[in-house]
Regions:
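Conserved alpha-helix/loop element of class I SAM-dependent methyltransferases that forms part
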Residues: 20-39
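Conserved class I S-adenosyl-L-methionine
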Residues: 40-47
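Conserved SAM-binding strand-loop segment of SAM-dependent methyltransferases
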Residues: 84-95
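A short acidic, Gly/Pro-enriched loop at the edge of an enzyme's catalytic core
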Residues: 100-107
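Core SAM-dependent methyltransferase catalytic element
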Residues: 174-190
Length: 190
């Protein structure tokens, strides 16, 4: 059995540095909320891959930490950060067996990765007034990607239930059968 880290390292070893910073639309649409954050102005990018979200948040003035199982992907992220003129911290972690680093975090984000065991840690790791940004595939993705593992898709209403202690800023929770991702932007009450 090939480990997740080996599989992702192999994938990223065949990749080259992205020609441009790819900004997650959920972050971009909440840029004003991000820019208005108070201290500690720290960000945690979970399952960061090549760190585009961490680099974007660093460019917005946050101290960004990127976590991923792939040292190769994080290495590409460090190159991206350098090219974009910012510094990020990268940490190689197997997220399936590791607890998230303690906060408090001003921003926690995670895109295209699902480990439901992390949801309580994500909510608890936010600083008062901190922001959560999360997007991944939902059950409607299985119509197009029939080989995709159904354990790794969100069910309708799941994000609203899992993050009920947070104030929802925007939410698409699997109700639209034409939308194959679900997302949430939420704030921890101050």
């Amino acid at each position: 059995v090939v480990s997740d880290a080996s599989r992702w390292n192999e994938k990223y070893a065949a990749a080259s540095l992205a020609s441009a910073l790819r900004v997650e639309p959920l972050l971009e649409s909440h840029q004003r909320d991000i820019d208005g954050l108070l201290a500690p102005r720290t960000a945690l990018d979970i399952a960061a891959g090549t760190c585009h979200a961490a680099v974007y948040l660093a460019k917005r003035g946050l101290h960004a930490t990127a976590l991923d199982c792939s040292a190769v992907g994080l290495g590409l992220g460090e190159q991206l950060a350098k090219r974009e003129g910012v510094a990020i911290k990268t940490t190689t972690k197997d997220l399936t067996v590791t607890k998230l680093p303690g906060g408090p975090w001003s921003v926690i984000c995670c895109f295209r990765y699902l480990d439901r065991n992390l949801f309580p840690q994500m909510a608890a790791g936010l600083a008062p007034g901190g922001l959560l940004f999360y997007r991944t595939f939902n059950v409607h993705h299985l119509k197009k990607a029939t080989a995709f593992n159904p354990e790794y898709v969100l069910q309708p209403g799941e994000l609203n239930r899992e993050f009920s202690t947070l104030e929802i800023l925007s939410l698409s929770d699997g109700d639209d059968p034409e939308e194959n991702t679900s997302w949430i932007a939420a704030r921890r009450p101050a």
